[in-house]
Amino acid sequence: MGKLHVIEAKGTERLKRGFARMVKGGVIMDVTNAEQARIAEEAGAVSVMALHKVPADIRKAGGVARMAPIEKIQEIMDAVTIPVMAKVRIGHVAEARVLEALGVDMIDESEVLTPADPFFHIDKREFNVPFVCGARNLGEAVRRIWEGSAMIRTKGEAGTGNIVEAVRHVRLVADNIRLIQRMTDEQVYAVAEKFAEPYLRLARQIREISGLPEQILENEPVYGHYTYREIVDGLYKILLEIKKLGRLPVVNFAAGGVATPADAALMMQMGMDGVFVGSGIFKSSTPEKMARAIVEAVNHWDEPDVIAAISKEIGEPMKGLEIEELEVRLEERGV
């Protein structure tokens, strides 16, 4: 099993969310081999994400990006004492089952890899291992939480070294939560109905192909064995919890475009619980220094003098990409 042995007899929601809380306030770094994993651990990372390539290289290589080779993940698991996460393609249940059997500590159902299912994300409640998923807005976040995600992260635009999309996603979620808090419960239920609509895409497409009316029957399953009304009720319950808390009910990390200590500090200043760093560490000129600096920036996010000091003599950050010039927008994957 993974380092923390958190997936005992049954992976309850409490256990899964408990693991996510254990990494709260920290930095999770993408690594592609044992040496990088050790650098991340020594720099103070709370966890590492095992990949075959960092997002910048996945973007550059093109083609179909899949789960990392098992040997690579095992090599990384054997190299460190901190928790190890790994990515699967959106909707790829079999990849997730393989990683669960391998004993990773958390699975990232990630838009960085090529999606496997054009209609649905994995029903994460069927697994013992906890999941993290990306979200651009509150609707995506609530859907992933209802499906069983123990942790949410911004999608940002991975592999760009450009923080703008992560900032966009943080603001979209935060401002939508503030709007929810001003709504009546009846209005919140209407939002739940709107947020549930993506689960109807497959059923509607089948009806269109078959020449049938678009209307979905109340007792008709549309996602696994769940009907549309059951999904709406589930999303409504989560939205009411969000309304009460004033935030997501799970740990919420920033990801996608973090490339400097100041980027990491900005995400924490905007209310994030921690930071994922993908290409920003090992595409910089001095990965060891950059890794330590970003960890320190997250620890001292509200101390500008400390951020200034740790930003000295850390070399060049990764080369950034302008979002409008991208041919492929990874953040648009998933529903």
Swiss-Prot record:
Residues annotated as transmembrane: none
Active site feature: 87 (schiff-base intermediate with d-ribose 5-phosphate)
Pathway: Cofactor biosynthesis; pyridoxal 5'-phosphate biosynthesis
Coiled-coil regions listed in the entry: none
InterPro entries membership: Aldolase_TIM, PdxS/SNZ, PdxS/SNZ_N, RibuloseP-bd_barrel, Thiazole_synthase_ThiG
CDD domains: pdxS (cd04727)
Catalytic activities: aldehydo-D-ribose 5-phosphate + D-glyceraldehyde 3-phosphate + L-glutamine = pyridoxal 5'-phosphate + L-glutamate + phosphate + 3 H2O + H(+)
GO BP terms in the entry: amino acid metabolic process; pyridoxal phosphate biosynthetic process; pyridoxine biosynthetic process
UniProt keyword list: Lyase, Pyridoxal phosphate, Schiff base
Protein name per its UniProtKB record: Pyridoxal 5'-phosphate synthase subunit PdxS
Organism taxonomic ancestry: Archaea, Methanobacteriati, Methanobacteriota, Thermococci, Thermococcales
Gene: pdxS
